[in-house]
Amino acid sequence: GRINQKWRLNLSQEKFDFIERVISIPKEAQGESLHNNIRDILREVGVLEGFLSEIEYPLDGQRLDVAWRKVVNGVPTRVFEVQIGGNVTEALSKLKHANDLWNSEPFIVITDKDREKVNSLLSGTFHEIANRIRILTVADVEELYRQALAHIELKKRMGI
């Protein structure tokens, strides 16, 4: 009843407050902290979508920022690299390796300034994953999180 409704509201408010904190990070402080916040949002969206969602997922001596698996002993279904001022070539290399190894769906999160470089690398060196990879912006991830939370809240209100 009433307590449950209040709890749901507070849970929602907490999550919306989290995304607002992420969005309001000053531009000059965005490097690593924005990277980690976007990584954490992707992990949370994976959980909301019913995946086993992990950060810093191991990949042959390297780490993927986020990996979503369907089952405990399964391989990642979706893998994410968040590139906020980092090495785009290294990120694409990890995503290609995950795709080759596990047939995972690769996603790269970039800022607008890196779009041209990513497109150039996908038309050359990484052409094998050009048709599979999804290029997301920080704004795309923020919107995905908002929509996932709104969808959960709608289902709760409807009792579904």
Language model: regions and residue ranges:
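Broad gene-expression machinery/nucleic-acid interaction feature
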Residues: 6, 63, 79, 105
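Nuclease-adjacent, charged terminal/linker segments that flank catalytic cores
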Residues: 1-26
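Acidic-basic catalytic patches of nuclease active cores, encompassing PD-(D/E)XK
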Residues: 21-64, 69-72
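A short acidic, amphipathic alpha-helical/loop segment
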Residues: 41, 68, 91-98, 121
